[in-house]
Amino acid sequence: SCLSRVTMVVWNNSDTMEPIFILRGFPGLEYVHSHLSIPFCLAYLLAFIGNATVLSVIWTESSLHQPMYYFLSMLALTDLGMSLSTLPTMLAVLCLDVREIQASACYAQLFFIHTFTFLESSVLLAMAFDRFVAICHPLHYTTILTNSVIGKVGLACLLRSMGVVLPTPLLLRHYHCCHASALSHAFCLHQDVLKLSCSGARISSVYGLSVVIATLGVDSVFILLSYVLILKAVLGIASHEEQLKALNTCVSHMCVVLIFFVPVIGVSMVHRFGKHLSPIIHILMADIYLLLPPVLNPVVYSIRTKQIRLGILCKFGIR
C-alpha cells in the first residue's frame, strides 16, 4: 500500500533518500474528503476576498493612511499569508487525494505556518500599543507613531517571528523518523512531525514550548496590560459619551484578539488534556485556529469600523 511504501522509505532513510510523509486529512472520513473540501474552499475564498478588499480600501483611500489602518494592513497581509501557507496541501489532500509530501516541503510549510501564527500575535500586540497611545496619549499620537516607527515595528514583528521559528525545521532535519510516517492533519505542524521521531527530540520539543510561552504568552500578557491601562484612562474621562466613543475604537481590536487567542488556548487545552478525545476533534481545533482569524478578521473590521465599511461601499459603487 501507499502507506507501507512510504514507511519503508522512512525506515531506510539515508543521506541520499529524503523521507516522505503522508498527510491524512481527516482520518476515518476519507470517503467524504471531496465533500469536506467545499466548506474549506469557501472559507479560503472568503479569507482571500475579505483581506484583499480591506487592503485595497486602505491603500486606495488617502483618508485611511493613518497608524491604525497601517497596522490593520499588516494584520490583513498576515492573514493572507496564514491562509496561503495551508492552502496547497489542504486542497491537494481534500480535492485531489494527493497525500504525499517530501520532508523538505513539509519543513518549509510548518516554518511558514508557525511564522505567520507568531506574526499574527506580534501584530495584535502592535495594534494594542496603537490603541494605548491613541487613548492614553492622544496629543502625541501622530508624533509617536510616525510612518518610520510603524515601518520599524512591522519589520521587528516579521524578524522576530521568523527568527524564533527558523531553528525548528533546522532541528527537525537532524532527527530520524522511524515510526509510521502518517501525519494527523492535511498540513504540517511542528508537534505533529516531532511525534514521528525515534531519536531524542526533547530539545526541539522544549524549544517549541519555550517559543510559544515567549511569544504568544508574553504578547497576551502585554495586550491585557495595555487594555488595563486603556480602561483606567477611559474611566478618567468625565463625559460618559466620550468614554463610550473611546472604548468603541477598541472593540474591533478586542474582537480579533479573542478570535485569535481563544482557539489557540482551546488547541493547547485539547492537546494537553484531551488525549481521550477523538482525533477528529484535535484536527478540527487545529483547522479552526488557522482558518478562523483570516475569515473573521476582515468581517469584524468591515462591520465595526465605519471608515472601512464606507470605503468598501464606495469601492463597489453602493454609495
Functional labels for PLM-detected ranges:
Residues 1-319:
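Transmembrane helical core of 7TM receptor-like proteins
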